[in-house]
Amino acid sequence: MISNFNLKPADKKSIQILQFYRPVCPCYTYSTIMPPKKRPKLLIFDGNALIHRSFHALPITMKTGKGEVVNAVYGFTSFILRAIKEFKPEMVALALDMKGPTFRHEAYKDYKGTRVKAAPELYAQIPRAREIAEILDIPVFQISGCEADDVIGTIVTKMKDKAENIIVTGDMNTLQLVNPHIKVYTMSRGLNDSIIYDEAQVVNKYGLKPNQIVEFKALRGDPSDNIPGVKGIGEKTAVELLQEFTTVKNVYKNINSDKIKPRIKELLESHHQDALMSHDLATIRCDIKFPFDEKLLQFGGFDREKATTLFNELEFKSLLPRLIQTGVADKKAAALLATARAEDKFTRNTSEFSYHTITTEKDFNTFLKKLKTQTRLAFDTETSGLDALTSSLLGISISWKKNEAYFLSIRQSSLHSQKGGNDLFNWKATDSKDTLHPWLIALKPVLENKAIKKIAHNAKFDIKILEQFNIKIAGLDFDTMIAAYILNPGSRQYSLDTLALRWLNFEKISGEDLLGGGKGKLSYSAVPVEKLGIYACEDADVTFQLWSKLEPELKKSNLKKILDTIEIPLIDCLIDMELAGISLNAPYLKKLEKELDIKIASIQKEAWKICKKDFNLSSPKQLQEVLFTDLKISSAGLSKTKTGISTGADELLKLKGQHAIIDLILEYRELTKLASTYVRTLPELINPVTGRIHTSFNQTIAATGRLSSVDPNLQNIPIRTELGRKIRAAFIAKKGCELVSFDYSQLELRIAAHIADDPMLKKAFKEGQDVHSTTASLINHVPLDKVTADMRRQAKTINFGILYGQGPHGLAQTADISYKEAQTFIDEYFAAYKNIKKYVDETITKGKETGYVETLFGRKRYLEELNASNAMIRKSAERMAVNTPIQGTEADMIKLAMIEVHTFIQKNYSDKISLLLQVHDELVFEVDPTIIKEITPKIKKIMENVIKLSVPITVDAKRGENWVGMKTI
């Protein structure tokens, strides 16, 4: 029906090809890309839709240091990289609208006439989006007189028999193109969620087949494009008509049918021409004439150096790691390209890099002479593995000048394996020439010299390695990984490779470049020393260069003090904690595992009995069927995923009380999760040499500044459930010692009282009242002595819920009360604690103005999402803004307490006390029982006075043989 537009024949150039651009990458041969057998994937991006969606999803405050707004182009780039990673296409294309009227405007002058002109900040980013596409070697199509949808329709039609076509877009216009070989991949919420539409998914969402989408718009219209449709016919009626008659043509053919109500018949007859015109306007044209060669679509080799330069210019530092991972789809071609690029890194221009691998005594002596004159150096260790307790040392690299570094090839096994003993931590008499490599002995005075400032990346690992050889690094001044984290705590991308790209615009030799991949992957020990030397020198060189970039940034942002006074001093404490480890009662856990297996099996049988059939309680798909089909439980208010209604724990909590099976499933999930994560796994983590578990503490994971731990994750062992307490009971003191716990009392609430300067909350703490009972009394308007246990429980939930930025919805779920009750409690809470309300409002307002929130110590968390137009994203950022100053201050206090207590122990009780664990507000020590009474008040005093607040800080102390069976001291 396109003929209704009276377009001139295409060969007379009524539709002109105004722009087509295909960048050519000289480093890649396109003919190697196409797999010969299976259909290749073609990703075709709807540029304008992605740009518009991104602009409205991300805050307009996303700007470069030069003030260029980049929110739309950032979202556009992020979604393109995500789609490429997910689908690994062999072919790609980008379609953009051309400025000016289209054939649809000629047919209907009011086409898109109701659209409000977009902000100039959006239009300014379109050339940047095109630049991104070109730098990624994606061909760009813009055709005069047509929309991007028509270009997409034409290309996928040409390729429907040759490729699996995936249209990547931000709207639903292209759903009409879906068929067995054409799918649509679109954002479903903001930029974080996506969904792929095949024929079944379109029918599931709209109740119509893809080819009926045009028919639907012809009847219903499309307000976003000002397509009129049939006035008076809504979505429901349009769907019903099409389900009965399939097409608009058939609707009119059967206009006198009894199945069409008189009122609807009248509307259809009155607006017949509007329906036909709307049909034409909504139809994506699939026969645009323009020169087309499918070889131009082939994707693979783009110039990463140029791409990295552009990403750095736009300050897309968080996207750089994804850029590294974006490559060609064909495995053989990818392998060839990767090998060639890896070799090129090892043979970079030697005039630029002065890298030296030292293997002879003569060269070492020359190097050592230079080394002793330095006042600052970067160092890095190369090891046989990533476990600092068991790995052998392969060498040390050192740099003190840009593009210059030295690698000392030292093949040294750890001393405990040489001695054949099992005491990893008693090597003070082993630094002799009989046990240590002579170069290590020569390096020891330099590395232990405080006057020579040291720089490292993830210094904790390198220091732990060197401690195996009784080399104790002194003068550690800078850790590039931690510095990058302090500058951008929300990134979670702090590898040396990533930081080199972000800050130096330099692509490092990666671990894969060095070791290879697949079955032929080498171990570090097997890498030729020449290659290992280049790799190691580069690590030290990059670390040194990063220091020169990151230190000024820390100073400019007034964050250097966080590094100097908290994070760097904490490293020694964490190393001692990790090396100390903690004992585990493995037989007890084995017994607990058997009990759990019986309980889990019992729950499973009970669930099967209720449903009258066997099913897998861990399968989301089977749960969906059982809950919503078999048992007909209402799914109203539950989130949806790509596979249907979500059966995640948070969603199932919304169904609590609706059916007996919900509680069973929740209990089953908790038991199976804790069984697999802790009960079965913990014994496997026992170090065979020490007989203890050695967790690793992370300083660069939590955006608030909190520490986290892995292998095992101690922070996630629940304390309030019976099973959680049973798991904690497995952590025990070694023979002849006891565990002593020092736990801050309600620290977050005390910090909140101080920061908000709330008189009622401060009064409660100063008078030693139970703050939860006080809150219960205030919000329920009853005397303290009339507060019930249930009132206190709800008040406790509210006290902490407010600190975590919870609204009535969240509070209703956590407190197990109605939305109305939750809103009433929040109103009463803010009426009682007026300054807490003031703190919440002012913190959010200030965060929107500055782009960040900060702790009492000045640690910053950047939250640009506070200005997001998407309400869900914005509300989430507001919750983070409210919580971060409190939780972040708490984290800083705990870290300072650890530093001071560790120093106190080292000076006075190093052979009788070991700090083992830090979990939230609690520190756990292993102590000689004879000194517990002596040291308890001293450690409490240190912890309670690490900072002065306007309310008292109190610490509770307990002792016992395991982590749970403790008694108050």
Each model region followed by its residue ranges:
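C-terminal polymerase-core module
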Residues: 598-605, 609-663, 831-879, 883-885, ...
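Accessory alpha-helical DNA-binding modules that contact the DNA backbone or grooves
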Residues: 209-212, 216-279, 290, 594-618, ...
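Conserved "right-hand" nucleotidyltransferase catalytic core of DNA-directed polymerases
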Residues: 271-430, 438, 491, 503, ...
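Conserved catalytic core of nucleic-acid polymerases
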Residues: 522-525, 579, 687-690, 694-695, ...
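Cysteine-centered motifs
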Residues: 25-27
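Noncatalytic, basic helical substrate-engagement surface that gates or grips nucleic-acid strands
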Residues: 35-168, 172-199, 274-277, 283-291, ...
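Charged catalytic and DNA/RNA-contacting regions of genome-maintenance
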Residues: 36-40, 166-168, 174-211, 401-404, ...
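Conserved RNase H-like, two-metal-ion catalytic cores of nucleic-acid enzymes
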Residues: 41-43, 47, 53-91, 109-121, ...
